[in-house]
Amino acid sequence: MACILSIETSTDVCSVAVSDNGAVILNKEDHSGPNHAVKLGVFVDEAISYIDSRNIPLEAVAVSCGPGSYTGLRIGVSMAKGLCYGRGAKLIAVPTLELLAVPVLLGEHPAEEDALIVPMLDARRMEVYAQVFDRALREVRPIQADIVDAETYKEYLDRGAVYFFGNGAAKCMEVINHPNAHLVKNIEPLAKNMAPLAEKRFVEGKFEDVAYFCLLYTSPSPRDRTRSR
C-alpha cells in the first residue's frame, strides 16, 4: 500500500493524480490541447503541496510509458524521473494501452464474459497502435502498429464481441465493418485510472531504473520516426 503520484501525457490531455492505497485522493486534468510543457509543472506542484500539507510520504511516481505522443511522453517521463530523484521515490511505468482499458473494464462495457477489448492510439492515416486483451486484462495479442483493414482483427471478431476504443478507434470502424465490432466512445488515458495498475505494480515490486528507463515504442510510423529525431 502506497502513496503514488501518477502522470499521464501520452495524448493531448495532460493529467496528474495522487492515489493512497489505491484510492484517488487528488486529480488534475487539462483537455484544452497539447499544453503539457505548461500544465504539467503546475499540476505536479499542486499535487506535491497536497501531499506535503498532509504529511503523506510519496513512495512512488507512476508514468505512462507509451505508445503515444513522443514529445508528450518525454515531458512526462522527464518530470517523473526528476520527482523520483528529488524525493527518493520509486519509478513505476504503466503502458498506455493497458491504462486505456481500465475505464472500459470498470464501466458498463463490455457486457459479454468472453468479449475482447482493443485499445487503440492514433498513429496517423489508417495506422494505429493497438493491443488485444480479455476482460481480465490478460494480453491476447501484444502491441503492434496496425495498418487497419477489414482483415486486421477478423480472427477475433469471428469468435465474438470485440470492443474498440481510444483516439485511434473511430476512424477504423467503417473499415472493420463487422457485426461483432463495437465502438466505445470518449475513452482517454487519464492519470486517475492509473491507480489500480500502479498500486499492483508497487505491491509486486515492479519498479524501473530511474537512470536507464526508456519509453515504449513499437514499429513507429515514418512520421513518428521523423518527429523523434
Model-derived features: positions:
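DPxDG-like acidic metal-binding loop motif
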Residues: 62-96
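Residues at secondary-structure transition points
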Residues: 31-42, 70, 74, 78, ...
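Stable alpha-helical structural segments in soluble proteins, enriched in small hydrophobic residues
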Residues: 47-51, 86, 104, 194-201
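N-terminal beta-alpha supersecondary unit
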Residues: 1-67
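Glycine-rich phosphate-binding/hydrolytic loop that grips phosphoryl groups
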Residues: 184-216
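Phosphate-handling active-site elements
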Residues: 51-56, 85-94, 112
